[in-house]
UniProtKB/Swiss-Prot annotation:
<keyword id="KW-0808">Transferase</keyword>
<dbReference type="InterPro" id="IPR003716">
    <property type="entry name" value="DNA-dir_RNA_pol_omega"/>
</dbReference>
<dbReference type="InterPro" id="IPR006110">
    <property type="entry name" value="Pol_omega/Rpo6/RPB6"/>
</dbReference>
<dbReference type="GO" id="GO:0000428">
    <property type="term" value="C:DNA-directed RNA polymerase complex"/>
</dbReference>
<keyword id="KW-0548">Nucleotidyltransferase</keyword>
<keyword id="KW-0240">DNA-directed RNA polymerase</keyword>
<dbReference type="GO" id="GO:0003677">
    <property type="term" value="F:DNA binding"/>
</dbReference>
<protein>
    <recommendedName>
        <fullName>DNA-directed RNA polymerase subunit omega</fullName>
        <ecNumber>2.7.7.6</ecNumber>
    </recommendedName>
</protein>
<comment type="subunit">
    <text>The RNAP catalytic core consists of 2 alpha, 1 beta, 1 beta' and 1 omega subunit. When a sigma factor is associated with the core the holoenzyme is formed, which can initiate transcription.</text>
</comment>
<comment type="function">
    <text>Promotes RNA polymerase assembly. Latches the N- and C-terminal regions of the beta' subunit thereby facilitating its interaction with the beta and alpha subunits.</text>
</comment>
<dbReference type="GO" id="GO:0003899">
    <property type="term" value="F:DNA-directed RNA polymerase activity"/>
</dbReference>
<comment type="similarity">
    <text>Belongs to the RNA polymerase subunit omega family.</text>
</comment>
<dbReference type="InterPro" id="IPR036161">
    <property type="entry name" value="RPB6/omega-like_sf"/>
</dbReference>
<dbReference type="Pfam" id="PF01192">
    <property type="entry name" value="RNA_pol_Rpb6"/>
</dbReference>
<keyword id="KW-0804">Transcription</keyword>
<dbReference type="GO" id="GO:0006351">
    <property type="term" value="P:DNA-templated transcription"/>
</dbReference>
Length: 88
């Protein structure tokens, strides 16, 4: 089978970072026993997840910008100049 690349998936997702989140989530679902949306193959779960994204079978149910905008508007972090902080 042909290789799946990030460029194959980008038309289906807003940006590369969203693609990573979506592929990770779908890979974890597949590893937990979720049924594949494509014909069974010998591909590993990450490859299968990318194939499903590239064909449009897996997608976000709302835009990434909408999903994240509310989250970051609520959280404000004040760090004094010259200091660093690890957010957990």
């Amino acid at each position: 089978m042909a290789r799946v690349t990030v460029e194959d998936c980008l038309p289906m997702v807003d940006n590369r970072f969203a693609l990573v989140l979506l592929a990770t989530k779908r890979t974890r679902q597949l590893m937990a026993g979720a049924r594949p949306l494509q014909a069974a193959s010998k591909n590993k779960p990450p490859v299968l997840a990318l194939r499903e994204i590239a064909t449009g079978k897996v997608r976000f149910d709302r835009s990434v910008r909408d999903a994240l905008s509310g989250k970051f508007d609520k959280e404000k972090v004040n760090i004094p100049a010259g200091q660093t902080r690890t957010l957990r």
